[in-house]
């Protein structure tokens, strides 16, 4: 595999499992030294996962103080960060909007939307100073379509898309590119939070008739995070199996 990310440092939030782990593995394979951010980072099996991150940090992305402290520590240790992948997220409960628990709403927004803002807010000044950066935010088809019974998740991911577009315009001449990926449903441990009915309904929307693989997201993210993606910013890359209509 081409080492087109050789010499670059990438932070992947929520990188201990699922989509985040697949992204971390793919960036490492492309030559990047990878920093893993997650709530708990001790349970890492280098043999099973195929590599050892250059740094693993316990970070709560819903806390600006936690994000800022971790980023400062990463810079002190590594000197530079060229790539940020905002992947950390939760689904929240599957329930009608008028019955949605306010505390669950707040938690989903805090992690899935505020977390993206906090990480970008912290990393962007460093990238601007260096005149180079690649930020990839993991959104969702739910953020484009709005999916019934997951109103908080849909709202948060729509916010991620809008934030990405706004910030990308601000940074368009600074060498820092922001894009996001909008996957259809992926087979990951997060499915445990969903009902069988919700899973079946989601699959029925995908013309290809299957769920997305985490590795397919990782392949897309790896290209967006690389130097060959040089004239695209503020864009939403769909991974929908034919579901996307705009």
Residue ranges of model-derived segments:
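Short, small/polar-rich loop/turn modules that mediate ligand/substrate recognition or access, typified
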Residues: 172, 177, 232-234
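Substrate-binding pocket helix/loop in short-chain dehydrogenase/reductase
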Residues: 95-97, 101-109, 191, 202
